[in-house]
């Protein structure tokens, strides 16, 4: 199951209570105070994890607590600090405070740590309250409560390339060919029911390993901006992409017109977020192995003269390697070598 939005309730650990204790020894039955401090409560920490790809763990277990600190003991023994609660988050997770509706954190890097709820400090033992006039204080502090809160987690995947297209245009097949992802493929619409994040590997150069992240979102349909179909719900997963890859069925399957398909796709993207149309985009003309595709491609180019089009066939793999090279070249130019998914891992 894919979950990209859920609500969690988090509670950091309370601090331990300080101790009231006095030194009692054989030759000193009325020694001074020696009560230890309480331990600090554990924090709730979000950890960016590139191997985690959705929020399903938090959908069905929304309550997460860190350990409380242990109480102080006599002989100046401080209580043990509570263990932190570390929650692994997929990259691109936005944390929204349910009370205010405002974003409070964002997980963007593998290994990034965000302390969302801080544990409470431990209370002081009675040793701290000894003065020149109060030699035997019978006073200690309770621990401070840990922070708590209710948060909405919203996943906006981080990818270099966003793949969009109408259902049955061949997006899942293309994703299988150019990445290590293995989405379901079949000859019917909506085989992709949730976003797929795939890694496109390239031969290493003198700078080391090269790779891109590609986000394949469920197929759009006309009216997606009005929440028809599946694609609109998942369009937020391409908001951060450097490049949009628009896949068009150039064979005109089921009497469709590739030129109109492209027009409607752009319209749905604009209705969802006009900023998406400002992103650089590349059109991949699929199903060029079909006889009618060549004529349709000529008509498409005449209408959309300024659009960069790469013909290919997912069935014969024609044009696939050229597409991979073009994606790397364009994303590298847009983001710079250091920003091309440096943390994508096996």
From Swiss-Prot:
Domain Obg: 1-158
Any one of the GO BP annotations: ribosome biogenesis
Residues annotated to bind Mg(2+): 172, 192
Residues that hold GTP according to the record: 165-172, 190-194, 216-219, 286-289, 313-315
GO cellular component terms, A-Z: cytoplasm
EC identifiers of the protein: 3.6.5.-
Broadest EC class assigned to this enzyme: hydrolase
Residues in OBG-type G domain copies: 159-332
Entry-linked Pfam families: GTP1_OBG (PF01018), MMR_HSR1 (PF01926)
Keywords: Cytoplasm, GTP-binding, Hydrolase, Magnesium, Metal-binding, Nucleotide-binding
Gene Ontology terms, MF aspect: GTP binding; GTPase activity; magnesium ion binding
Superkingdom, taxonomy of origin: Bacteria
Annotated function: An essential GTPase which binds GTP, GDP and possibly (p)ppGpp with moderate affinity, with high nucleotide exchange rates and a fairly low GTP hydrolysis rate. Plays a role in control of the cell cycle, stress response, ribosome biogenesis and in those bacteria that undergo differentiation, in morphogenesis control.
Family: Belongs to the TRAFAC class OBG-HflX-like GTPase superfamily. OBG GTPase family.
Name assigned to this protein: GTPase Obg
